[in-house]
Amino acid sequence: MDNNVDTITLTDEEGKETEFEVITKLDIEDKEYVVVVPKNEEVDEAIALRIDNNDDGEEVLVPVEEDEEFNMVAEAYELLFSEE
């Protein structure tokens, strides 16, 4: 995924498209993640997505659902933004 991407559009299971603002991209333990928030909605929480490759080699974004992995991403995110 390009580091200069500011917004992405994701499609949910029902085909509804939502535009998200990319807050940051993180490289953790040989995996890439993006932290996003819905662009036109007020929310208190960001969403962590892992960048994987599908069977065709295309990049896909997968929600981080395992607690251990989510905590690792959240910790890296907090560390990054506590330094600013």
From Swiss-Prot:
Transmembrane regions: none
Family from the record: Belongs to the UPF0473 family.
UniProt-recorded name of the protein: UPF0473 protein CLD_2004
Organism: Clostridium botulinum (strain Okra / Type B1)
Taxonomic lineage from the root: Bacteria, Bacillati, Bacillota, Clostridia, Eubacteriales
